[in-house]
Amino acid sequence: MRMLYRPTATKLPILRAVALLKDRHGVIDIQLPISGSLDDPQFSVGGLIGGVIANLLTKAVTAPFALLASAFGGGEELSTLSFAPGSASIAADAKKRIDTLGKALADRPALKLDIGGRADPATDREVLRRASVDTAVRDEKMKSLVAAGNAPASVDEVTVNSEERNRWLTEAYRSAALPERPRNALGMLKDVPPAEMEAMLLADAKIDDDALRQLANRRAQAVKDAIVATGVESERLFLIAPRLGNEAGGVEGATGEAPGVPARVDLALR
């Protein structure tokens, strides 16, 4: 059954539901599970239509992403996208959800999307601390490559294999302004095991909440860029203030409740 949308609704929930159901041609396509005999005096198409529409409107308001997923061939939850600790790279399963979401937004031009990143103070902070130490190690090798005249364009392109890591770890340890490095009677640095050097560098690597929020923002921006790549206009996508852990706020309509998965991006439809 097809119904042409007429702009007579005035209540916001109805308008949001219509935006969710109306396709790019201005048509709302509703499937009616009709069975029975027209000769049956108890048979009522009107009642059936009313019930289906009421159910759709309710679902459009209370579970909009579930409705989109069912309409566009995605069985996954579309309202959250999880990330690996410390990473802003979109995983393969999240990319599939974004592709489904891109199809849905392309066919529902009245919809807009809020995108809010989250970072986990526990797991993300630990990974970022280790990444900070790894960067310091690569920096030391980069200095050597610069001196030799064959440095890459960026330290991100420098690789340190397991055989040479202790060498550059030692250089990073000696270059760092660590407060309590073991020294001998002459005040010179003592040789310490690599594990101890790394532990001191990790302890000195300070990852504050601002760094975590920057990571959350990078996640949100990565999701926005991926959705834009599907063909959705950037003007329909809005970045929301980042949040840490499961703290409330951010994307309106997101519960902030995803135990064990606070490293994510929350999505909400407007």
What function would you assign to each model-found segment?
Residues M1-V261, L267-R270:
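Extended terminal
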